[in-house]
A protein has these predicted regions:
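N-terminal Rossmann/SDR dinucleotide-binding element
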Residues: 2-73
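Glycine/Thr-rich phosphate-binding loops of Rossmann-like dinucleotide-binding domains
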Residues: 14, 62, 84, 123-124
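Active-site loop signature of alpha/beta-hydrolase-fold enzymes
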Residues: 37-38, 80-83, 121-123
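Conserved catalytic-core motifs of eukaryotic protein kinase domains, centered on the activation segment
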Residues: 42, 83-91, 124-128
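Catalytic helix-loop patch of NAD(P)-dependent Rossmann-fold dehydrogenases
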Residues: 93, 97-101, 108, 112, ...
């Protein structure tokens, strides 16, 4: 059976994607997240998923599933979203490089990928301009998301 993967599935957006998929009858969902924050139970307790994959084990499992044509699609919502995180190395590894690895695997295996960016890549402007010349990331989180967007 083919799987729908939702990274960041215990977060606000990811859990709502799973809820919508459930409402459409989808149960073949693999929820990927870091559950070190136990309060995330409030987002996932009512969801119907096939299995949970810890974030730190995901890439290895994902490549095996993809190699065996067992992935229907990926919703990549997972990221360190704290705009106050000051560990640039962690943000680049977790948000940028992790996203690139997922994207490369999806491209290699023709797996549809839905990726969530962030409005923070445009900075604190009063006017929205989504042109590629108006990027003003004002913290490391925004910069890591911007690089992933450009990838």
């Amino acid at each position: 059976m083919s799987h729908i993967i939702v990274t960041g599935g215990a977060g606000f957006i990811g859990s709502r994607i799973i809820k919508e998929l459930n409402s459409r009858g989808c149960r073949n969902i693999l929820l990927v997240d870091d559950l070190s924050d136990a309060t995330k139970i409030n987002n996932i307790k009512d969801l119907d998923i096939e299995d949970f994959i810890p974030k730190d084990k995901f890439m290895e499992i994902f490549m095996v599933l993809a190699d065996n044509d067992l992935v229907e699609s990926v919703y990549h919502m997972g990221a360190e979203s704290s705009t106050t995180c000051t560990d640039g190395n962690y943000l680049m590894s977790n948000n940028y490089q992790y996203t690139c690895n997922i994207a490369n695997t999806c491209i290699l295996h023709n797996i549809p990928l839905v990726y969530a960016s962030s409005a923070s890549v445009y900075g604190d402007s009063d006017v929205f301009d989504d042109s590629s010349t108006n990027y003003i990331p004002n913290n490391m989180y925004a910069y890591s998301k911007l690089l992933a967007d450009k990838y």
